Amino acid sequence: MTPDETLSAVRAALEAYVDPYLGETLGAAQAVREVSATGAGLSAQVVLGFATGGYQPELANALGRHLAAAGIEAPLAIELQSDIKAHAVQRNLKPLGDIRNVVAVASGKGGVGKSTVAVNLALAWTAQGARVGILDADIYGPSQPLMLGLVGQRPTSPDGKHLRPLVSHGVSAMSIGFLVDAEQPMVWRGPMVTQALTQLLGETQWGELDYLVVDMPPGTGDIQLTLAQRVPVAGAVIVTTPQDIALADARKGLKMFEKVSVPVLGIVENMSVHVCSSCGHTEHIFGAGGGERMAREYGVRLLGELPLDAHIREEADGGRPTVVAAPDSPRARPYLEMARRTGAALALRARDRSALFPKIVVEET
């Protein structure tokens, strides 16, 4: 083959590779940008629409094997880049200024570990190179101040109107828990709660973010409705455990987001398997396969199956969640993979095109 024919064959082979996180070929994702020959072999630039930190060695090895299977044996150097775009939100709403994507983490039932999933998702995206914030929308029972090691700290206001978020482990955070005493109960009616959420979101100086993770309260009440009607959400993640009682409520949460035209990115099955802290024995104490069955039932992705491990609880309670406390541990890997799958699921959604169209102003004469 001529050099040009070789490069064309390499590009075709690369574009035929099915990325495990996207679930589609690199060609369909328009991810292969440049293919060239170098003195040492071949070079390819791959651009993906999700945070890719730490993924380059895995992808390079997989693509090398893929090319070898196609009969192309030349050494391959992969330049992997991330290009996170703003994605479409509910009709009649526009993305929030410098925040490209708002991702709601929700559950129909309390006690399934949703806040632990939300904070580790935010931290995993940060570790993978994204700019991330987290909004604790559980006004009645905020958990993020404790999990992020920020209990007792207060945000400042540069102008008396806006708040600067607190920063922990590289994540910008805002919570009602930063503004009230830790032991003060929030005895508020629905309108006060929804107003508080709106202010926390709109009056915080988030800066430029690729993702804003919203840690939702359990259920399908006022806060969820406010989020759907007033906040431009690019996608939702539903957290459940494998047991039937949790799955029943998770289904309600999923249907609620569908009803208000918020796309569901997928299901996270938390507490999927119990890991004994003494011997490492694993056991499905809450059942097995519930999250996978639910994902299949509703035609969405299973984003992750996360372990029930005493270390995860201890690390979150200590203000250093697992992704930060033990990033190379076996218990952290499912969180990192879950974050990559979630980012990839969002990357496949329709992009926001509003910035491409001029504003039309109708003046009366």
Where is each model-derived feature located?
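Short glycine/serine/threonine-rich phosphate/pyrophosphate-binding segments
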Residues: 111-120, 142-143, 216-224, 246-249
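Extreme N-terminal, non-catalytic leader segments
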Residues: 28-31, 36-40, 45-106, 339, ...
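C-terminal boundary of histidine-terminating zinc-finger modules
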Residues: 318-329
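Glycine-rich phosphate-binding loops of nucleotide-dependent enzymes
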Residues: 174, 216, 229, 337
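Conserved catalytic-core segment of NTP-binding enzymes
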Residues: 57, 61-63, 206, 210-211, ...
